[in-house]
Design a protein with these regions (language model features):
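Radical SAM/AdoMet-radical enzyme domain recognition
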Residues: 1-19
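Auxiliary Fe-S-binding modules of radical SAM enzymes
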Residues: 26, 31-35, 39-157
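Charged helix-capping and loop-helix junction motifs
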Residues: 16-21, 50-52
Length: 157
């Protein structure tokens, strides 16, 4: 049995909760699989957590568990182009960026390819991110014919 759970503000938004949950899952012979970012639907404003904090919670929890718990991937977002994992925050060429990758993508060639979004401390979902380094589009967007402006909801129609 593989496990997955959303990361929700007011419910499980601390590394300690995730660390203990993953350990308990392994004790029960379950395999930690995904930590999901709360989807941008419903009561979004109550449950949402900025992406950098999601990554920080994941990183801190992950660093406190043994290898048998480190089967988990996250924080991830299931969006129109695929399942996107936030790998971290970095500074590249003087620009603070989010480092991302596709765990699964509409095009298999996208899988496991790192890409970068401009850092936004308020962003809570992929559709709120812009490409880094002054680019107009993420590398995969040429395969989609339409897209609303950033921050206007869904990235793809």
């Amino acid at each position: 049995v593989r496990t997955q759970s959303p990361l929700l503000r007011h419910i499980n938004d601390s590394p300690e909760i995730w660390r203990e949950m993953w350990r308990k899952q392994v004790d029960l012979s379950c395999i930690p699989y995904y930590m999901f970012v709360a989807r941008d639907t419903g009561a979004k404003h109550y449950f949402e957590i900025p992406l950098e904090k999601c990554w920080d919670i994941f990183r801190k929890a992950y660093s406190q568990v043994s290898g048998i718990c480190r089967t988990v991937r996250g924080p991830s977002m299931s969006d129109e182009p695929g399942k996107i994992q936030l790998l971290g925050v970095a500074e590249i060429k003087g620009e603070k960026v989010f480092v991302l990758r596709f765990i699964q993508g509409r095009n298999p060639k996208w899988v496991d390819m790192p890409f970068f979004a401009a850092y936004d401390p308020k962003a809570t979902w992929f559709s709120e991110l812009r490409p880094a380094f002054g680019k107009d589009y993420f590398f995969f967007e040429h395969e989609f014919p339409t897209r609303p402006m950033y921050g206007d909801g869904f990235l793809f129609e």
